[in-house]
Amino acid sequence: MKVIRVVSIGVYLDDEKEGILLPKRYVPEGTDIGDELNVFIYHDSESRVIATTQQPAGTVGDIVMLPVVSVTPQGAFMDWGLQKDIFVPKSKQRLGMHVGEKYLVKIYLDEQTERVAATEKFDAFLSNEILTVGEMEQVSLVVYRRTDIGYFVIINNKHTGVLHYSDVFTELEPGDTLKGFIKKITEDNKIDVMPGKPGYERVTDEGEKILSLLAENSGY
């Protein structure tokens, strides 16, 4: 966003209205009017729309693993990388949350409060009915849970699939993220995924790694 005004408490960024404040503690040294800054917009503890150069663990629509830092009768607060913790309403928790524990949650925009919040109950947001991915396509994966045959994973925060134990050579835990690709889609839209890159890209990457190792070891 473009800087439109410099004041003693920070700078104002252009939102085509009155401007959004970026507090002084987040303003990069030497920032001036006309500069473009990469920021995240959210409501602070006083319900003001505010900007920050801090980057959260996720944005609206993302499914991420976050730690609980405090619990109240109304819900729990989780650390997501910003000064203001993200709130998980009691009604959006599965079995309750505990300080110090980590939980897999989906970040969403609460339509009533217009604030960013998080929920453990995100299964309804995941569907394979209409797929937005195809075979051999590169995707982002989040490990959801273990099954008898492999890891049940979330694909691009939208779909679900299975990463078979035989296709992965390291131990994974719920919340782990990795890049992969669509190995197979069945007629009923069940998806198998593989870690890494597909086909030629995978071979090229492995070849480059081997050449790099040979170079480091003088060809041996």
Positions of predicted regions on the chain:
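Single-stranded RNA-binding regions, centering on S1/OB-family and related RNA-binding modules
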Residues: 1-220
